[in-house]
């Protein structure tokens, strides 16, 4: 029975070829960062408060003038079409049905216009953002931005933590690389997973990076598209280049992949409308800290001037509430469908159990921190002093 994200992960392990599951599930090198993301969240405990009227508990929030069903969204997932045909579209529709935003990845396998249209059919108010990698040829990025704007994407998310790709040792061991090459072991893997293999075969083609292909007329085959994606990212990209993107994009502009408070302050200074505290799910720098451990400092650095988002290790709605409690009071407040719906329900249930009606009522005194990050001792003491 699939009751939560961990159940879905176990199901995916059974149903997907190993090289596909490991690509999605794995991290960089020894995967210490990947494990830290979850372990550091688990080290935080929530302390309920009693005898509060929670009849009208509502996990909804308003961000950039739009109402979200809960403080969560779908982060960009590259190559999701490898997991299931039209995976990008399915994720977007699940987010639309749940009332939370979906961020489409640059290396997605469905046309960004088609994904947007499908989400709008599910919900005319669907929240959709576009993630952007900037490669050496900036004309590719410019075309993607123009297409996203024309299609109705409401926010642009510039990812800045992938100047080079992390060393994904699971992928190396599995021989998984782009362009993909079949080996005896992968052929056996495919034979042992006929359901997945049949679904891919029925597409009549391998998943391809269609949006990159349309941005580069020469990338007409999966091999050429893979070569395009694997080009070195633009290492000359600097904070000053946010002005270049601002000229192309008049909606909210977020910077994703920040872990240092100094970078958070620079994002504000250079006109970003939001930041995403992210270590790329532990898939880039294995020595990086968990996102929850640096989150309070990042929130302090922006001082309430822009929204702060975070990813990495979140598996339960209670994990989301822990993040809210960890940063409550640090700065002025500015205000696949089954998994997402479960997370929304989980957040609402956790609020009631804590004795809170809304997410902005979650406070430091709700958190007992057994984690050595800045402010954790204060949070623990606040919990002890409350009442």
Task: Go through each PLM region and give its residues.
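Hydrophobic faces of well-ordered beta-strands that scaffold small-molecule active sites
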Residues: 72-75, 102-104, 128-132, 156, ...
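Glycine-rich phosphate-binding active-site loops on the catalytic face of alpha/beta enzymes
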Residues: 160-166, 272-288, 320-338
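Alpha-helix-loop-beta-strand connector modules within alpha/beta enzyme cores
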Residues: 115-127, 184, 234-253, 286-310, ...
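Conserved, mostly hydrophobic/aromatic
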Residues: 17, 74, 95, 158, ...
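An N-cap/entry alpha-helix motif that binds or orients negatively charged groups
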Residues: 1-65, 179-237, 361-362, 368-387
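Catalytic cores of alpha/beta
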Residues: 142-145, 259-271, 298-310, 314-325, ...
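Glycine/Thr-rich beta-alpha phosphate-binding loop at enzyme active sites
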Residues: 57, 78, 167-174, 178, ...
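Glycine-rich beta-to-alpha transition loops that act as phosphate-gripper elements at the mouths
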Residues: 106-108, 135, 236, 254-261, ...
């Amino acid at each position: 029975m699939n009751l939560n994200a961990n159940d879905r992960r176990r199901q995916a392990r059974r149903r997907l070829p190993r090289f596909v599951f490991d690509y999605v599930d794995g991290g960089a090198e020894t995967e210490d960062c990947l494990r830290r993301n979850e372990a550091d969240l688990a080290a935080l405990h929530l302390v309920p408060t009693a005898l509060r009227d929670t009849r009208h508990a509502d996990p909804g929030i308003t961000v950039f003038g739009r109402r979200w069903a809960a403080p969560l969204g779908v982060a960009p997932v590259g190559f999701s079409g490898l997991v299931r045909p039209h995976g990008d579209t399915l994720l977007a529709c699940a987010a639309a049905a749940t009332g939370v935003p979906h961020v489409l990845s640059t290396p997605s396998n469905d046309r960004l216009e088609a994904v947007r249209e499908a989400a709008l059919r599910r919900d005319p108010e669907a929240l959709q953002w576009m993630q952007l990698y900037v490669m050496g040829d900036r004309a590719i990025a410019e075309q993607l931005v123009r297409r996203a704007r024309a299609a109705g994407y409401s926010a642009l998310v510039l990812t800045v933590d992938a100047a080079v790709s992390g060393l994904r040792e699971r992928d190396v061991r599995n021989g998984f690389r782009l362009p993909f090459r079949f080996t005896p072991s992968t052929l056996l893997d495919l034979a042992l997973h006929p359901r997945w293999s049949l679904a891919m075969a029925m597409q009549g083609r391998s998943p391809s990076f269609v949006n990159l292909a349309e941005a580069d007329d020469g990338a007409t085959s999966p091999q050429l598209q893979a070569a395009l994606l694997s080009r070195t990212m633009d290492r000359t990209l600097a904070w000053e280049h946010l002005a270049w993107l601002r000229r192309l994009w008049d909606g909210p502009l977020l910077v994703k992949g920040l872990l240092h408070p100094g970078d958070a302050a620079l994002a504000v200074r250079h006109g970003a409308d939001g930041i995403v505290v992210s270590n790329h799910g532990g898939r880039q720098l294995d020595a990086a800290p968990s996102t929850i451990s640096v989150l309070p400092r990042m929130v302090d650095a922006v001082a309430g001037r822009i929204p702060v988002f975070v990813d990495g290790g979140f598996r339960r709605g209670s994990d989301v509430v822990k993040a809210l409690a960890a940063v409550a009071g640090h700065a002025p407040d500015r205000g696949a469908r089954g998994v997402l719906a479960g997370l929304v329900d989980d957040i609402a249930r956790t609020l009631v159990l804590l004795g809170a009606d809304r997410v902005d009522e979650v406070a430091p005194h709700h958190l007992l921190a057994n984690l050595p990050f800045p402010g954790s001792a204060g949070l623990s003491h606040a919990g002890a002093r409350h009442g």
